[in-house]
Swiss-Prot record:
One GO-annotated biological process of the protein: DNA catabolic process
Position of the signal peptide: none
Name of the protein this chain belongs to: Exodeoxyribonuclease 7 small subunit
Catalysed transformations (reactions): Exonucleolytic cleavage in either 5'- to 3'- or 3'- to 5'-direction to yield nucleoside 5'-phosphates
Principal location: cytoplasm
InterPro entries, per the entry: Exonuc_VII_S, Exonuc_VII_ssu_sf
Keyword Thylakoid: no
Length: 74
């Protein structure tokens, strides 16, 4: 069973990957590995955001929240 994804840690890890890749000090192989990990983290972060958006929508529907505005996508 895999660990539960931590969104905040995912963002921190993405920032570290970006800094490492922008430094220009990585070999081609390391750059590809970092890029691959970054893509996976991006997918996990997006999935976590989608789940949060769905939960917010569900909760506001249950409470008949009438002032709901759609969330903006980045």
């Amino acid at each position: 069973m895999s660990e539960k994804f931590n969104f905040n840690q995912g963002l921190i890890d993405l920032e570290k990957i970006v800094k490492a890749m922008e430094s220009g000090d990585l070999s081609l192989e390391d750059s590809l590995n970092h890029f691959s990990k970054g893509v996976e983290l991006t997918k996990q972060c997006q999935s976590a955001l989608n789940k949060a958006e769905q939960k917010i929508s569900m909760l506001t529907e249950q409470d008949n929240y009438t002032n709901e505005k759609p969330l903006k996508r980045l």
